[in-house]
């Protein structure tokens, strides 16, 4: 398993001073849920045999995670996928399809779900629809695919070497794609400036906003993450994306910060 965000060095600093007002039963044995979703192209076409991976970074109430931390599956002919075993916490989901740039997002999953010996899991009422995109058919696009291959192989040094060559004149989509690849490699320090540059190029960039929201969440900066997820939701007209983004915003609303 790849290092659990060893390069998110600022995570604990971002969470310092945050007081979580926990639900009475937030501790103890946590129920698991089934999360369903789809992987489709930008045009909505199902992507068969895409790899879907889920990794937990924090547990209930954004504390220490206990249990099975990673899951992986593949999509069927309709692009559908399903994972049983998602416990309350903060999870990073990624979808990788052949010849596509990975789609990746961190989400809160029932952070303050009541627990106990009779607590049972259930199917989450929203589906996580992820949309990997094709890279440009030119040397720049091949550079992104090389970085993707290295990221999936856990070769962080190669990822850093490739992504540091991102052209200065790259557009927002290209920069956001590079940021997602950096996040797949768990190189948060490299992903952040790429997402920020993407937003500077295009303040309406959906994927750049989603990348920033994910980074805030992985740092447990819940207030900033909530605002960033709201900004992300405002940048898409896709009803499925709006639904799971609304679920994330609602989940973060259960955490009160003093």
Label each region the model flagged.
Residues 141, 173, 207, 241-244:
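Start-of-helix register in tetratricopeptide repeats
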Residues 169-171, 203, 237:
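Short coil turns that delineate tetratricopeptide repeat
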Residues 177, 211, 244-251:
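Canonical tetratricopeptide repeat
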């Amino acid at each position: 398993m790849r290092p659990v965000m060893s390069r998110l060095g600022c995570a604990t600093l971002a969470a310092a001073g945050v007081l979580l007002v926990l639900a009475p039963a937030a501790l103890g044995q946590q129920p698991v849920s089934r999360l369903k979703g789809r992987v489709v192209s930008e045009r909505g076409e199902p992507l068969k045999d895409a790899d879907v991976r889920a990794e937990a970074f924090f547990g209930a109430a954004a504390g220490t995670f206990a249990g099975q931390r990673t899951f992986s599956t593949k999509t069927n002919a309709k692009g559908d996928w399903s994972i049983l075993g998602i416990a309350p916490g903060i999870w990073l989901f990624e979808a990788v399809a052949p010849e596509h740039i990975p789609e990746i997002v961190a989400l809160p999953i029932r952070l303050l779900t009541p627990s106990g010996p009779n607590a049972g899991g259930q199917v989450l009422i929203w589906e996580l629809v992820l949309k990997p995109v094709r890279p440009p058919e030119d040397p720049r696009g091949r550079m992104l695919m090389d970085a993707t291959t290295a990221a999936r192989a856990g070769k962080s040094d190669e990822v850093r070497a490739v992504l540091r060559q991102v052209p200065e004149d790259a557009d927002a989509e290209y920069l956001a794609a590079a940021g997602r690849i950096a996040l797949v490699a768990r190189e948060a320090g490299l992903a952040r400036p790429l997402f920020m540059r993407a937003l500077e190029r295009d303040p309406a960039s959906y994927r750049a906003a989603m990348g920033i929201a994910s980074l805030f969440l992985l740092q447990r900066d819940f207030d900033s993450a909530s605002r960033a997820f709201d900004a992300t939701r405002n940048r898409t007209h896709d009803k499925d994306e709006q639904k799971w983004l609304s679920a994330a915003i609602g989940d973060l609303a259960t955490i009160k910060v003093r």
